[in-house]
Amino acid sequence: MTIFLFVKQFAEKELNIFIPDAYLGYEKMEKIDFLFNKMNRPIRICGMVKNEGEPGGGPFWVIDKNDEWSLQIVESTQIDFSNEKQKNIVQQSTHFNPVDICCSLMDASGKPYDLNQFAAHDLFFTATKDWNGSSIRILERPGFWNGAMANWLTRFIEVPADTFAPVKSVLDLMDGSRWK
């Protein structure tokens, strides 16, 4: 096994990096550049809990405008529920949005990444919100973990459900279970 095949398999299996079929035809320096570019990124490890019907999004494989797959945290407002395929994927999802996120923000030499380089600046979606008793449609930019971290290396791990204490409204803060 060549080093390039070993690194390719590691990148795909352990780091969830999409590697196009064309990679096998790349010249040596093209392979090095490609792998370095894909692997030299900040890392986020996201602790996810089992989905027990709470509203919200979760961890999904997403295809971007370049037809590249990546692991992303997707909010429910980003999902087209009129699309049966997307609706079924959400209904069959096993896990919920991250409870904990641990990040590595330095490169291999200890230098901080320019995190702005790894954000999806062109990402947006429309959402319906309530405003003064009326339903309005707004243009929304994704938040920190699903927009600003869109091009990070991502791993999802399962964590115990008791680490999950969602706050969807101020009344959720009154729930005594979160103060144990």
What are these regions (language model features)?
Residues I3-K180:
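OB-fold and OB-like single-stranded nucleic-acid-recognition modules
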